[in-house]
């Protein structure tokens, strides 16, 4: 489980990215890099680190499912991920 402050910071960063997305797109199209530089640093989507939707873990994130490898394994064993089966050969 990640610290609650890290999860809160992640949520705040998501809101900033959404808030400035249109303005950022327009400024990039114009080529106005000076105004882009004045936007908040965390409004840049490149700075976003993907986190597990369940417990906020930043490492071993599986993009297709939105969870870390640990939670993926638990959910797969419980049968809560549609289409995921245990491999056997």
Curated annotation (Swiss-Prot):
<dbReference type="InterPro" id="IPR001209">
    <property type="entry name" value="Ribosomal_uS14"/>
</dbReference>
<comment type="similarity">
    <text>Belongs to the universal ribosomal protein uS14 family.</text>
</comment>
<dbReference type="GO" id="GO:0003735">
    <property type="term" value="F:structural constituent of ribosome"/>
</dbReference>
<keyword id="KW-0694">RNA-binding</keyword>
<dbReference type="GO" id="GO:0019843">
    <property type="term" value="F:rRNA binding"/>
</dbReference>
<dbReference type="InterPro" id="IPR023036">
    <property type="entry name" value="Ribosomal_uS14_bac/plastid"/>
</dbReference>
<comment type="function">
    <text>Binds 16S rRNA, required for the assembly of 30S particles and may also be responsible for determining the conformation of the 16S rRNA at the A site.</text>
</comment>
<dbReference type="GO" id="GO:0015935">
    <property type="term" value="C:small ribosomal subunit"/>
</dbReference>
<keyword id="KW-0687">Ribonucleoprotein</keyword>
<keyword id="KW-0689">Ribosomal protein</keyword>
<protein>
    <recommendedName>
        <fullName>Small ribosomal subunit protein uS14A</fullName>
    </recommendedName>
</protein>
<dbReference type="InterPro" id="IPR043140">
    <property type="entry name" value="Ribosomal_uS14_sf"/>
</dbReference>
<dbReference type="Pfam" id="PF00253">
    <property type="entry name" value="Ribosomal_S14"/>
</dbReference>
<comment type="subunit">
    <text>Part of the 30S ribosomal subunit. Contacts proteins S3 and S10.</text>
</comment>
<keyword id="KW-0699">rRNA-binding</keyword>
<dbReference type="GO" id="GO:0005737">
    <property type="term" value="C:cytoplasm"/>
</dbReference>
<dbReference type="GO" id="GO:0006412">
    <property type="term" value="P:translation"/>
</dbReference>
<feature type="region of interest" description="Disordered">
    <location>
        <begin position="34"/>
        <end position="54"/>
    </location>
</feature>
